[in-house]
């Protein structure tokens, strides 16, 4: 058995991150993302609530429960894609998850690195170095690279302990899971490290990312209407105070 395979089978577990925008923002910025970017709450998928999300919003992170119904649909969809294929841009940055409870961190990585063309990085920070090191690697090799990275493991632990909720133990069962939605090359992709590949949810654009993600979530809700445990966060550029003042002024003038 190779050292890498032994690492995978050892199944390292981390403390789960809290679905808290402040926690994820601090975590992301500590790893080299410009302070111009932050996570914010998305309070619902109705059009009015989506309009409250600052623009640009370049990624959406969804926290949801893993149920038996979801797992059945997941395996069915994966089999269908394996048989029929799907459009998958080579520009999509996707990695597998080999660390227990690391889905929050992987959701942040997927959100950030699929927007490396618009997000500013610290040249010496984790994200820039990890992207440079892993761009040419396979999804499995990227996961192994993360598994071996002590810097992000330490940052994850610090952030996990900063949340407002009670901190679970590393080996405590967790049924909630983070996935990321991003727009790449004209399509909406769902990025979930538990799945073998990114899922293409159809045509999209930078402008319609929020609406298109909301449509996917609505389908999930329709399939299991009893399940209401969802949490949404957006990766957005911090609103410019001057721009906000101008917008308020325009609103007043149009009244």
Swiss-Prot record:
Positions of the record's site feature: Important for enzyme activity: 192
Organism: Dictyostelium discoideum (Social amoeba)
GO annotation terms (biological process): protein catabolic process; ubiquitin-dependent protein catabolic process
Positions bearing the site annotation: Transition state stabilizer: 97
Annotated SUPFAM superfamilies: Cysteine proteinases
Entry's EC annotation: 3.4.19.12
GO cellular component: cytoplasm
Keyword Cytoplasm: yes
Keywords associated with the record: Cytoplasm, Hydrolase, Protease, Thiol protease, Ubl conjugation pathway
Residue ranges of the region described as Disordered: 235-255
Region feature (Interaction with ubiquitin): 16-21, 227-232
Similarity section: Belongs to the peptidase C12 family.
Biased segments, Acidic residues type: 242-255
Protein name stated in the entry: Probable ubiquitin carboxyl-terminal hydrolase
Record-linked CDD domains: Peptidase_C12_UCH_L1_L3
GO MF annotations in UniProt: cysteine-type deubiquitinase activity
Residue span(s) of domain UCH catalytic: 13-237
Reaction catalysed by this enzyme: Thiol-dependent hydrolysis of ester, thioester, amide, peptide and isopeptide bonds formed by the C-terminal Gly of ubiquitin (a 76-residue protein attached to proteins as an intracellular targeting signal)
Active site, UniProt feature: 103 (nucleophile), 177 (proton donor)
Gene encoding the protein: uch1
Pfam families xrefs: Peptidase_C12
Subcellular location: Cytoplasm
């Amino acid at each position: 058995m190779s050292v890498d395979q032994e690492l995978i089978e050892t199944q390292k577990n981390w403390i789960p991150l809290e679905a808290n925008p402040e926690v994820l923002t601090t975590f992301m910025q500590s790893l080299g993302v410009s302070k111009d970017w932050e996570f914010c709450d998305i309070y619902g998928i109705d059009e009015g609530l989506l309009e409250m999300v600052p623009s640009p919003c370049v990624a959406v992170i969804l926290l949801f429960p893993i149920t038996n119904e979801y797992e059945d649909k997941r395996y069915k969809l994966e089999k269908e894609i394996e048989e029929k294929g799907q459009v998958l841009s080579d520009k999509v940055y996707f990695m597998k998850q080999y660390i227990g409870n690391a889905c929050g961190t992987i959701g942040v990585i997927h959100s950030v690195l699929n927007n490396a063309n618009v997000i500013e990085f610290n040249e010496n920070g984790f994200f820039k170095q990890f992207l440079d090191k892993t761009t040419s690697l396979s999804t499995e090799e990227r996961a192994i690279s993360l598994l071996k990275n002590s810097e992000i493991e330490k940052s994850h632990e610090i952030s996990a302990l900063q949340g407002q909720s009670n901190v679970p133990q590393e080996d405590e069962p967790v049924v909630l899971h983070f996935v990321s939605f991003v727009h790449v090359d004209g399509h909406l992709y769902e990025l979930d490290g538990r799945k073998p590949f990114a899922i293409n949810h159809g045509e999209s654009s930078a402008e319609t990312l929020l609406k298109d993600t909301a449509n996917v979530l609505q389908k999930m809700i329709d399939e299991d209407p009893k399940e209401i445990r969802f949490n949404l966060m957006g990766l957005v550029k911090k609103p410019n105070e001057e721009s906000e003042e101008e917008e308020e002024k325009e609103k007043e003038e149009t009244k």
